[in-house]
Amino acid sequence: DTAAQAEKAHDPATCTDCPVVIVRGMDMMGLYIDKGTENERNAFEFDLGDLLSMLYKGISGAVKAKDIDPFFQAVIDYAANLLDGYAMKENGESKYNVSVAKYPGSAENYPEIWENFDSNSERGMTRACAENLPANHTYLFTYDWRLDPYKVADDIAATVDRAIAESGHDKVSIFCASMGGIMTVAYLTKYGYSKVDRCVF
């Protein structure tokens, strides 16, 4: 029955499926400023009004000056403001209190991140793994893509260790998506391959 199957899945002596850690790719909309507070907002805030204002300012400035430079400057200023939420200080720290939604446990604890996704995206991959491994052997790893990959590698290592501890297996499989491959290479470089059964890029 289902209970017996779940118990079997947790028993490494009878379970042949290594837990899977899915290292997602870069997520432009996945970073939040002041997450969990009343001031929470996405680090990337597009506003059509700001875009139209920039175009008006740039075009009118170029016409008035009979020079294209005012238009280019308006575009540069607009881009700087649009991407300001991603800004980092010279010391490598974030300019703002930026964080990403994290899912430290297995996918069985977060059905909302995969149950209704049927695609080739990371969440679709998570669903495929959760339904076939099952969910208690599936981990979706998210990260702040602005950070040094070797710093992100430490968090990947923690996720790998958690997957091993919770599943009872001695190794994991790592599936990478896009920029997640860079982060995974940093993990393998820093921590080695001893806890990895296979890695799919």
List PLM regions with ranges.
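N-terminal non-catalytic accessory region
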Residues: D1-F175, M179-F201
